[in-house]
Amino acid sequence: MSHSVGNNDLGDVKDVTGSVSGIFGIDSLALFGSEAGGTDAASALQKSIDYSKKAAQNGAIVTLSTHMPNFTNAKIKKNADGTYDFYNCDFNEAKDLSGDSLKKILPGGEKNEVFKAYLDTIAVYANALEQENIPVIFRPFHEDTGGWFWWGSANTAESYRSLYAYTRDYLESKGVHNMLYVYSPNGPLETEAEYMSRYPGDACVDILAFDSVSYTHLRAHETSAHL
């Protein structure tokens, strides 16, 4: 179980069990939007930082997942000062498969600057936690073996690996060194070869995992056994 970020004291788990949860999970949607109670991009980021710090102070492990928007989506607005506003983007934009987004956000692509702006905010979040020696388990581009997200199976394995490696390299160039990177394809997975078919490589990945949603306990157990 994880803390809820929809209130000020993160007390839901404690109210039920008598103790705070050991894992605090947050998504990048909270860094940019209203999930953590922010009323604009700046307050969303600050609330996400504050909640994460408080959870860590209470002994929790902090995790960050990402449901990044399709960076060709019209909900992304460019401000007059040249910055980008992702506040109105939600889960649905991660499922927007149009526009060949992955190709366009890599170096040389027309949306690379937009993607870097998004990563810059993730870097601000991570660096704020690193100042207090708080590590973050970072799970970007999960369920890549499925076809429902723009970074998923419609792209080649080579393109996906390039995206993953570029993301880590860029964040490290921004001074982010407190993240443990997770590779988490969609289960069930029957063989090692199937699991490794899009694996970004040991230089990029610190933790192996998988996503298993709406499957029976048996199928999740089978995938765990294969790993």
Residue ranges and their predicted role:
Residues 6-13, 47-48, 121-124, 187-199, ...:
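Alpha-helical scaffolding within the catalytic cores
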